[in-house]
Amino acid sequence: MSASNQQPSPLPVRRALREVGGSLQTWRKLRGLTQGQLADRAGVTRMTIVRMEQGDGTVRTEILLRVAHALGVLDGLPRALDPYESDLGRLRADDRLPKRVRPRSLT
């Protein structure tokens, strides 16, 4: 689906984008970096950093990870998304995960 025909992001997603953007900005400032310096370290443009800090959701996941790496916070991201680091994931740790999930019939 192209960006031009995507549905608007739900409010919780927009809030999370702004929160992540604010966190990136705070980390950048804590590291004493300008937007340009961070962009150079991450191999992106300064405008990409500006967009990320403003909560622009069109930035690719790889770019987010490169910026997190440049800020020294990359290690925390995979852990934050690890299902076994959550209560639900731990509860289901004994369940066998299927190799493939098939759509359920609605009939």
Describe the function of each predicted region:
Residues 6-30:
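A short, Lys/Arg-rich alpha-helix, primarily the initiator
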Residues 22-38, 99-106:
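Short basic helix-loop element that most often maps to the first helix and adjoining turn
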Residues 24, 35, 46, 61-64:
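Helix-turn-helix DNA-binding elements, focusing on the entry/boundary residues of the two helices
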Residues 32-50:
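Short alpha-helical DNA-recognition segment
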Residues 56-69:
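Short, basic-rich loop-to-helix N-cap that marks the start of a DNA-contacting helix
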Residues 78-107:
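Short, charged recognition helix plus adjacent turn
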